[in-house]
Amino acid sequence: MRTGTIEVVAHHVLVLNSVTRSLPFPVTTSDTVKEKFPEEIRLRFRVLDLRRPQMQSNLRLRHNVVKLIRRYLEDEHEFVEIETPVLSKSTPEGARDYLVPSRVQPGTFYALPQSPQLFKQMLMVSGFEKYYQIARCFRDEDLRADRQPEFTQLDMEVAFTSMEDMLKLNEDLMRHVFQAVGDIKLPNPFPRLTYAEAMDRYGTDRPDLRFDWELKDVSDVFLGSSFKVFADTLESGGVIKALCVPGGATVFSNTDLKKGTVYTEASKAGAKGLPFLKVMENGELEGIGPLLSSLKPEKKDQLMELLDTKTGDLILFALGEQSSANQILGRLRLFIAHKLEVIDTSAHSVLWVTDFPMFQWNSDEQRYEALHHPFTAPNPEDMDDLPSARALAYDMIYNGVEIGGGSLRIYKSDVQQRIFEIIGISPEQAEEKFGYLLECFDMGAPPHGGIAYGLDRLVMLLAGESSIRDVIAFPKTTTAQCALTKAPSAVEPQQLKDLAFPKPTS
């Protein structure tokens, strides 16, 4: 035994197989491979990498999470697991599809599902009141640490449900999972923020509440200001937002703020400049000259009281349209918090974000597009002004990461047609792409709602990893390739001929 409490004396040893080539890295219980060997090597020799204690633990954790979910939904709430098609129809309004050519219907294509969205809604019309699935999904999009071209969702849908019922069901589920696998006690109930509150206070719809820095609107402080940049912004209908960074004045130099790391991060979010002030001894301020000189004593006191500043604090400003100012400071809030290591990594922050806008304006295409997806139900109070409507949507946020998102759904064909028209899908296009769904809605569809969790991302967070590749047995690289099998690869000419594809040119 590993403990040494039992010793086995062997009389005969039979070698079942031999290692006939040198190993690219050692596999030991000390598990230092991840630090010493690049990920490309570990993915190329994944069968060895999976022997490591860390990977064994991660994949067994994944198994336990799925097992807990299945047992809870089936045993406690009588959900039915139903598989939906993998070969389906390409539809607009989403990421790029993976397409599969049909041999028996030349010139036509299946699409691999980005989610089981439409099929699970049709299951609600079919009389299955509680559906779930551990679903494989596919999206042809640019990759990053928490995205893969193929990924796994916990997918759920419930008929005759309310938003409150959906939130409670999912809070109970997550409390059960987190407690069982990590002895983590999540609050009851989960805190909630509306989309507008989250954006206004934290600059993001995925706020990390493990630290309490908040954005403040300081526009009133600078009304009538002689600082031209601020005055012009307010005159044109913009806002001035501020973020107070405790202790930031002693950490970041003026160079950091004018052209260094902090300024660079702000510019990535669209900032054209980064006005700042530092709170020095006796409440004196230092910073941008014209900004300082524009602050009369009573305005300075008003600003410092509003931000509750202390000696050594740093005040950062963003200006312009409210959405852009929020975005700039929201990005800086997270960047600086990581830089200063103020986030309590042992804490667990979970909340719901609700009341999302139904639509966002796509300035490139000059049209509205669905913020979530076009099957989300609008708030009944906003039916008279759908372009500005709030959605009956809800996202679950854990430590600043969206782990699940859902909504109540549209279940009447006339409402669905109106939503399609707003996002630029004509009645003819709607019939061609979604006629089968609209037909179902006309057969007595019940009210329904659902949610989907990114299972890979959820397990990644529970495992304390920074990449979902560390909780997937055989993941793709950031170039959407399998380092082990070399997929995707060229195929035989006859295979292309069978599909009526032209031969590839050399």
Model-found features: residue ranges?
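Class II aminoacyl-tRNA synthetase catalytic cores and aaRS-like
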Residues: 1-506
